[in-house]
Amino acid sequence: MFTFISDLDHTLIYSHQKDGACVEFLNGCGLTYMTPAARAIFYELLKQDDFLFIPCTARSYSQASRIEFIKNLPYMICDLGGSVYVDGELDSVWMSILKDRKYCNPAAIEEEKNWIQLYFEIPYIKLHYNRDLFFLLVFKNTEEAWQAWNRLKRRTTPDIRYSLQGRKVYCVPTGLDKVNAVQYLIEQYHLKNIHTSGDSFFDKKFTEIGTTLLPAHASITHNTEYRTKATGMQAGEELIKKIEDRYRKTNSSILT
């Protein structure tokens, strides 16, 4: 089995791409895109019985499920590793582990959210509360987001941390990390031949597992990584072509 565990946004799919093939719609409007070549190759890979794709995303299950190729996948990691889905159902074993090992901290997140709503002076467009796992602030532009993060990062404690991602600032428990969910799935289901991709701080630890492939614009680095030459949506195509090449070399089935 060839296993590909990857972040979605800014790794495989990209927003505001007029020349791309749309793979996600909301209320009739296109949201995210891939190059036509990337879409065609990836959809063929997904048809193969010995190719396993596991999304590993900050998105909620409902947000991720809007994407065309997120259909009938056996495993999915959502909410920055706070949720593991097996055959579309929330994995209760993982939820117990999450609490027992204190990967989540609902009380600290709630307290910080309340402080933001009462005292934070930099205006934000919206505050999105992801269950009791984490919350994020969306700002008008990247400059305002940076200004907010520059202030909020001083509030980092042993319980929470703030991270800047474009126009968004995330407040996340220090124990919540995608890598924990990835390791759980690998151990629980004996996954082999692991390849990982991502672009941001949230992807750093889990992309140390297996063979690492990163887009050129990624903010993370690894000693043994493969990094694309292209950036943006073209980087997504290059990543998928590299995955196809690795799949062909390590599996007996041949794409036609």
Which sequence ranges carry the predicted segments?
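Active-site neighborhood of HAD-like aspartate-dependent phosphohydrolases
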Residues: 1-4, 8-55
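Hydrophobic "anchor" residues on beta-strands that sit immediately upstream
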Residues: 3-5, 75, 195
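Short loop/turn segments at strand-loop or loop-helix junctions that form parts
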Residues: 6-18, 79-81, 87, 216-218
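Conserved beta-strand/loop elements of the cytosolic catalytic core of P-type E1-E2 ATPases, chiefly
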Residues: 30-31, 172-176
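Active-site phosphate-binding/coordination module
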Residues: 34-118
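Short, well-ordered alpha-helical microsegments
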Residues: 61-65, 145, 178-179, 203-205
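Acidic beta-strand-loop-alpha-helix segment within the catalytic core
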Residues: 81-169, 173-174, 187, 252
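Mg2+-dependent phosphoryl-transfer enzymes with acidic/Ser/Thr/Gly-rich catalytic loops
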Residues: 172, 179-256
